[in-house]
């Protein structure tokens, strides 16, 4: 990999850890806060330097539009030939009715054309976030969470799950006897799901986030 300064390596490693932990990269503000920069603008300068060195790619106009480049084991990376020239058409899922598939036609309010560089893996749909239970992971009310359909997920990944009649976004952790769905906000309680519960179904994992107003 291209030789980086110590500070650039810190930024690069932070991006990599964030993608491994949550499925999507940090915002400029999160980088600044984590590494003690004076402002998000300082983080932006380091990101541009990394882009010039060819180790990341920046998507214009997106707070989390950062992709790792030039390493074979980059976590969950989504690559397409000539990705900058292509667009993904993704359905936006609003409220989900009890007992019906999450991608049922009646749940889809519209489709968005999105730059593939916004996501760490190819998403299947966008889910409009409701509430602040994942606030401390940078997921806010009204955000659009990019979701890849999966039937399995790793510990620490942010998932979309069906619990009975509800659909929720939480961080997954395996515990003795079941699963814990962890909220990233101390005002919300975690949810324990017993092993084999018929009430639980994994709908997918988070692979990107679009802040309200970025599309």
Swiss-Prot record:
InterPro entries: LexA (IPR006200), LexA-like (IPR039418), LexA/Signal_pep-like_sf (IPR036286), LexA_DNA-bd_dom (IPR006199), LexA_repressor (IPR050077), Peptidase_S24_LexA (IPR006197), Peptidase_S24_S26A/B/C (IPR015927), WH-like_DNA-bd_sf (IPR036388). Residues 28-48 bind DNA. It comes from the Bacteria. The active site is at 133 (for autocatalytic cleavage activity), 170 (for autocatalytic cleavage activity). It catalyses: Hydrolysis of Ala-|-Gly bond in repressor LexA. GO terms for molecular function: DNA binding; serine-type endopeptidase activity. It is an enzyme of class 3 (hydrolase). GO terms for biological process: DNA repair; DNA replication; negative regulation of DNA-templated transcription; proteolysis; SOS response. Keywords: Autocatalytic cleavage, DNA damage, DNA repair, DNA replication, DNA-binding, Hydrolase, Repressor, SOS response, Transcription, Transcription regulation. The record marks 98-99 as: Cleavage. HAMAP family: LexA. Represses a number of genes involved in the response to DNA damage (SOS response), including recA and lexA. In the presence of single-stranded DNA, RecA interacts with LexA causing an autocatalytic cleavage which disrupts the DNA-binding part of LexA, leading to derepression of the SOS regulon and eventually DNA repair. Belongs to the peptidase S24 family. Homodimer. This is LexA repressor. It comes from Burkholderia ambifaria (strain ATCC BAA-244 / DSM 16087 / CCUG 44356 / LMG 19182 / AMMD). The gene is lexA.
């Amino acid at each position: 990999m291209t030789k980086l300064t110590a500070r650039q390596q810190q930024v690069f490693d932070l991006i990599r850890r964030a993608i491994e932990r949550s499925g999507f990269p940090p915002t400029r503000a999160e980088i600044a806060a984590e590494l003690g920069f004076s402002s998000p603008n300082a983080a932006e300068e380091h990101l541009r330097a990394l882009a010039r060195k060819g180790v990341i790619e920046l998507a214009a106009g997106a707070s989390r539009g950062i992709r790792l480049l030039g390493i074979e084991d980059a976590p969950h990376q989504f690559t397409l030939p000539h990705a900058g020239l292509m667009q993904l058409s993704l359905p936006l899922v609003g409220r989900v009715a009890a007992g019906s598939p999450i991608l049922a036609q009646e749940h889809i309010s519209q489709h968005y054309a999105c730059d593939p560089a916004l996501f760490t893996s190819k998403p299947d749909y966008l889910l409009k976030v409701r509430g602040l239970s994942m606030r401390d992971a940078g997921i806010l009310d009204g955000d659009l969470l990019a979701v890849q359909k999966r039937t399995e997920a790793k510990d620490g990944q942010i998932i979309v799950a069906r619990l009975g009649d509800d659909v929720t976004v939480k961080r997954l952790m395996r515990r003795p006897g079941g699963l814990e769905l962890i909220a990233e906000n101390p005002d919300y309680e975690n949810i324990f799901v017993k092993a084999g519960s018929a009430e639980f179904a994994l709908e997918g994992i988070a692979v990107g986030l679009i802040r309200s107003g970025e599309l």
